[in-house]
Each structure stands twice: as C-alpha cells, then as structure tokens.
C-alpha cells in the first residue's frame, strides 16, 4: 500500500499502540490530544509515560494540540477517544475537516442516553466528509502487548467491504493482522458488551472464586451478549469470531484489562470512585453496564449477568449477593441463547 497520512484522535494507550503499528508500516501518523504535557512529551521525549513507562516511540510519530493540523490532508482518521466524548470530538472534526477521508473508530462502548453505537454517531456528525462507510477496528487486543509488537489479530468491520479491506491493508503486518467483516452491529456490540462481562469476571476473582466460576460467567456472558446483539440486528456468528469470543477472553481473563481490574477491586469491596481515581483511565464497562441494562429492559432481553453488575454499581446491591443470586434463577436450557 502507498504511504498514507493518518490522523489518530486520542493519544491514550490504544491510540498510541496503533500509531506505532501504522508507523511501522511506513505511514505518516499524527496523534491529536488536548493535554499539553502529554503532547509535548510525545514530541520531545518520544514517550507516553502515563500509559507506557518503558516504551520509546519512533521519532516520526508526531502529536499536536491543533485538530486542524492533525486532520490536514489525512487519508484516514481514526477515533480512539472515550465513548462519552465521541460525539463532541466528531462535531469538532466536522467543523474543521475540509476534505473527504476514510473514518475509522477503535473505541468500545455505547453512548449514554441515546444508546447509539459509535459508528452511528460518526455517521450523524460527519457524514458530509465521509469517503466511505465507517470502519470499526475491534478485537482481542491489549495495548501493552501490541506496543511491544506481540502478535495481535483483530477485525476491520464496515458495511462497505472495500473500506474494510483498505483498513485491513493499512494496519496489517508481520505481527498485526486484520480480518474483514461486514457485520458492524455485531462487532460493535461485542466490543462494548464484553466490558460488562469482564467486570463480572474480575469481581469473581476479587471475591475469591476460582476458574470454574470465571469460565461460567464468560461463557454465559457470551450468551447474553449474543441475545442482545441478535435482537439489535447482528449476525450471531460474529460473536464466535475475534471481535466476539476472542475479545471476551482477552478482556475477561487478564490483569491488563482495566474492566477486569475494576471488577476485581469491586469484588474486594473497594468503592467505585476510588477505583476510577486510582486507575486514571476510563473504565468503559461501568457506563456500558447502564446503557446495556436499559436496552435490555426496553427490548425484553434476558441479561442476568448485566443485571447483577448493574444492581451492584447503580443500586448499591452487594456484589457477592448479586452474583450468587443468579444461582437461584429459573432453570434454563444452555441452547436458549436466543431467548
């Protein structure tokens, strides 16, 4: 692929790791953020120490506080900002972007209030500047592993297969490989909802339960993710792929996962506000739990794990009692994933 200019909006851990992937592939990368100290550190020291203490970035990776500068002549734009500010940043992009570009996002969440997927938000806010359909970049991927060039396989999903293949070629190399998919609903819901299950798996660990319990919550969590996704129009097969079960495994079993760590802390009895303060990073699973619970209630979808996590976080229920309460739920067939 010829050299491309890519603007990455959000110099967090994942945005920085993806910047390195693109730089390794010979593309021109510009990171945009709004914290002067961080931007200066990336440009001066070639580090992003808040996320990666021992990683030195290539000097070719540049960062800026100026959104217009970041977007100038960009062939592709990658959103990697927290879900809650995606619409705000998209509005800002729409005001300064003066040409059409391929727009991607690599965030995982659902917008509070509207319940919208992130691709829908981007379509609504910057439709005039889209060169193609939105492309979703999602899958089992710890930034801590990608940044050291560990093998990573994820998904590029778009209703426009040509756009998905463009992004596949843009990112893929000897350690980072993308597979295409046209089921945007499935890929986005899988990426968002697995964070809830990761909180649950972490909570089990914090409470002292073993691998049997963790395997159960991950497996039954996949069932309820699939139930809701299919109700929203997804292909159930998507949930058996990289962006589904793959992402659920990596997020629901690893200390690298901030959602898992948050759940573990909740299980140990720590307060949510203290957990968020100590992490210093967005825990998407917390807000996604509320959105998913509201959607499930509205559509009548059975999501017992999501409900248990919701009641613990938002209604003050004891997390151990909420989880153990599921053991007395009505008997069901394992094959009732769709009901």
UniProtKB/Swiss-Prot annotation:
The keyword NAD applies. GO terms for biological process: carbohydrate metabolic process; glycerol-3-phosphate biosynthetic process; glycerol-3-phosphate catabolic process; glycerophospholipid metabolic process; phospholipid biosynthetic process. It holds the Pfam family NAD_Gly3P_dh_N. Its EC number is 1.1.1.94. It catalyses: sn-glycerol 3-phosphate + NAD(+) = dihydroxyacetone phosphate + NADH + H(+); sn-glycerol 3-phosphate + NADP(+) = dihydroxyacetone phosphate + NADPH + H(+). One of its GO terms (cellular component) is cytosol. It is found in: Cytoplasm. The active site is at 194 (proton acceptor). Transmembrane segments: none annotated. Keywords: Cytoplasm, Lipid biosynthesis, Lipid metabolism, NAD, NADP, Nucleotide-binding, Oxidoreductase, Phospholipid biosynthesis, Phospholipid metabolism. NADPH binds at residues 13-14, 108, 143, 258, 282, 284. The keyword Ribonucleoprotein does not apply. Pathway: Membrane lipid metabolism; glycerophospholipid metabolism. GO terms for molecular function: glycerol-3-phosphate dehydrogenase [NAD(P)+] activity; NAD binding. Sn-glycerol 3-phosphate binds at residues 108, 139, 141, 194, 247, 257-259. InterPro entries: 6-PGluconate_DH-like_C_sf (IPR008927), 6PGD_dom2 (IPR013328), G3P_DH_NAD-dep (IPR006168), G3P_DH_NAD-dep_C (IPR006109), G3P_DH_NAD-dep_N (IPR011128), NAD(P)-bd_dom_sf (IPR036291). PROSITE patterns: NAD_G3PDH. Catalyzes the reduction of the glycolytic intermediate dihydroxyacetone phosphate (DHAP) to sn-glycerol 3-phosphate (G3P), the key precursor for phospholipid synthesis. PANTHER family: GLYCEROL-3-PHOSPHATE DEHYDROGENASE, GLYCEROL-3-PHOSPHATE DEHYDROGENASE [NAD(+)] 2, CHLOROPLASTIC. Belongs to the NAD-dependent glycerol-3-phosphate dehydrogenase family. This is Glycerol-3-phosphate dehydrogenase [NAD(P)+]. It comes from Streptococcus equi subsp. zooepidemicus (strain MGCS10565). The lineage of its organism: Bacteria, Bacillati, Bacillota, Bacilli, Lactobacillales. The gene is gpsA.
């Amino acid at each position: 692929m010829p050299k491309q200019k890519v603007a990455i909006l959000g110099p967090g851990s994942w945005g920085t790791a993806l910047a390195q992937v693109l730089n390794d592939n010979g593309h021109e990368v510009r990171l945009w953020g709004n914290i002067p100290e961080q931007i200066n550190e990336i440009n001066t020291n070639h580090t992003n120490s808040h996320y990666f203490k021992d990683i030195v970035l290539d000097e070719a990776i540049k960062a800026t506080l100026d959104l217009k500068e970041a977007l100038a002549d960009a062939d592709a734009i990658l959103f990697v900002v927290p879900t809650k500010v995606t619409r705000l940043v998209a509005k800002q992009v729409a005001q300064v972007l003066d040409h059409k570009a391929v727009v991607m996002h690599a965030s995982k969440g659902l917008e509070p209030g509207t319940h919208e997927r992130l691709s829908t938000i981007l379509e609504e806010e910057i439709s005039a500047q889209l060169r193609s359909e939105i492309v979703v970049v999602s899958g089992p991927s710890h930034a801590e592993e990608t940044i050291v060039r560990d093998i990573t396989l994820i998904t590029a999903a778009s209703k426009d297969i040509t756009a998905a293949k463009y992004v596949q070629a843009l990112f893929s190399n000897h350690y980072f490989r993308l597979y295409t998919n046209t089921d945007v609903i499935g890929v986005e819901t899988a990426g968002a909802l697995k964070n809830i299950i990761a909180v649950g798996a972490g909570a089990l660990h914090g409470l002292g339960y073993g691998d049997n319990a963790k395997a159960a919550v991950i497996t039954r969590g996949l069932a309820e993710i699939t139930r809701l996704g299919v109700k929203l129009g997804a292909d159930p097969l998507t949930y058996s792929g990289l962006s589904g079960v793959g992402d659920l495994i990596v997020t629901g079993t690893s200390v690298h996962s901030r959602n898992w760590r948050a759940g573990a802390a909740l299980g140990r009895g720590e307060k949510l506000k203290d957990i968020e303060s100590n992490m210093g990073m967005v825990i998407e699973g917390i807000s996604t739990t509320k959105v998913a619970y509201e959607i499930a209630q509205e559509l009548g979808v059975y999501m017992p794990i999501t409900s248990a996590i919701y009641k613990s976080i938002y209604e003050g229920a004891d997390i151990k009692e909420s989880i153990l309460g599921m053991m007395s739920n009505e008997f069901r067939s394992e094959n009732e994933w769709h009901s």
